[in-house]
Amino acid sequence: MNLSEIGYRRVVVKLGTSVLTSGSKQLDKAHMVELARQMSALMKAGVEVVLCTSGAIAAGREHLGYPKLADTVANKQLLAAVGQSQLILAWSQLFSIYGLHVGQLLLTQADLHDRERYLNARDSLNALLNNGIIPIINENDAVATNEIKVGDNDNLSARAALLCHADLLILLTDQQGLFDSDPRSNPDAKLIKQVVNIDDSLRQLAGGAVSGLGTGGMATKLEAADIARRAGIEVVIASGHRRQVILNAVCKEDVGTHFTALENPLESRKQWILAGQAAKGKLVLDVGAIKAVTEKGRSLLSKGVVSVIGEFDRGTTLQLIDSDGRECARGISRYSAGDLNKIVGKHSDEIESLLGYDYGDAVVHRNDMVVL
Ligand SMILES: Nc1ncnc2c1ncn2[C@@H]1O[C@H](COP(=O)(O)OP(=O)(O)O)[C@@H](O)[C@H]1O
Ligand SMILES: N[C@@H](CCC(=O)OP(=O)(O)O)C(=O)O
């Protein structure tokens, strides 16, 4: 393996519950050690690895002897709180076989949404990697309510890849990659080896199916792939049980589905906008505004806003959607929902007289916006 010729410096590996449990109800440590071996080999060859691991809830169930618990958020938090310590213990022991230390980062949406916390998380990741320690990331399920949850580890791993400026994201799951329909329900489904563009027809293929203990299925993997490739990060979706899968993916061998990265990655501030999540609010845009924003690279003005959805403060990241609810851009609002409700459809010149102040003509400035 000549990794110096490959060119990847930093790789994020995401392991789904389906991989960690091998489809059973418990952590498959025999398989985890094999994955740790491959990641350790990369670290020793000079390729830095960040591990994004699911499996806390499954590990919690196993550790407590499969208790009968109602399917509530609080009970999932209980299972994650118990299971996360088992999970990190397992990884710490398995990597120690290869002489490597691990460091744990449990993140929530809020850590990615707030610029200062985002930069702090980035510093921690870099400090670990600069010292040859493998960062192990999971969502902080025990404290995350639905509002502050990223929600699935596919998205979390993409955001982590942006955070640490990785150049490859490997999403490992229980299928060989992305198929043209769900291989669980269609045995004739065909593997898609290369994806250059992610559009609505591709999203439809991903459907909603999820393996036994997993969250999100292929749909969240596609979302993750889209976030990463926009930031100039290549993505591979492959089977976590394929022999040498991590090493082969890093050596650019033909494994699973490969997503080409966009050539002009977004600058860092736009990456941060994409790394956070537009959780709190939406603006519905008229046709002219959609065109101005998506085709002409303009800022969004109040005149082009048809309606405001949700309650939010100034400085919140919003989804900019069309009348069918399709998201066309994401950006930071210069006005609160309350203010926006007073100025929708109005000319920018009227803002000061309507509000008694103004924060500029743009409701969402183009420097604070990512067109999707
Ligand atoms: N087009 C598709 N190609 C591959 N898998 C798909 C597709 N559509 C849905 N799936 C489902 O997605 C599942 C993997 O997602 P998930 O259960 O969340 O796994 P993980 O725990 O690895 O994140 C597969 O088992 C498969 O049934
Ligand atoms: N944070 C959760 C996993 C959430 C998740 O996205 O799971 P998966 O679809 O298996 O990657 C856990 O550790 O159990």
Curated annotation (Swiss-Prot):
This is Glutamate 5-kinase. It comes from Shewanella woodyi (strain ATCC 51908 / MS32). ATP binds at K14, T173, D174, T215, G216, G217, M218, A219, T220, K221. One of its GO terms (cellular component) is cytosol. Its main location: cytoplasm. Coiled coil: none annotated. Keywords: Amino-acid biosynthesis, ATP-binding, Cytoplasm, Kinase, Nucleotide-binding, Proline biosynthesis, Transferase. GO terms for molecular function: ATP binding; glutamate 5-kinase activity; RNA binding.
